[in-house]
């Protein structure tokens, strides 16, 4: 099948096999129920590598809100209700991401952690200076602090050693789910972390790096 099976022994006791509408369901409601119980979920445990320690909120350095447990909670709930098979994503090239986003932005993302640690830093990489009106916008900085600000709109986009791998796997999850639907599945759920809906053509922000839904 498409993708790699993450959970071979999924409890299927909740799945519905009868075509009859059971008591308490309208035909339309039961159809939705059946579709959801046939739906594949695409998920990658590689998101666990993206585990920022802190973020800047309301003038204070606080524990990061966007953390692995957010996705893990949903993953565990999918299993608990027997929503359907959970599969891993296939690997996808970044060609489409570079059509949605500026290629130089996508090329920058895998380099952030190495650039950060090359300066002797060990904590979460966060931007703290941003280009403002009146400064030249046609020249990209070549130092990591300037580059982080150049490619972001807030300080909610921390990087640690596993962040890029999580970004890439989230991108792959979305594309794999999209292909399942294109191949005839009625529905597929892309359980993406980090999320992507705030990311723009040339910038990250709001915990988002690649706009997964736009790419898919």
Whereabouts are the PLM-identified features?
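N-terminal leader/targeting segments
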Residues: 4, 18, 38-41
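N-terminal, intrinsically disordered charge-dense segments
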Residues: 12-18
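Positively charged N-terminal leader segments that act as targeting/secretion signals
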Residues: 18-30
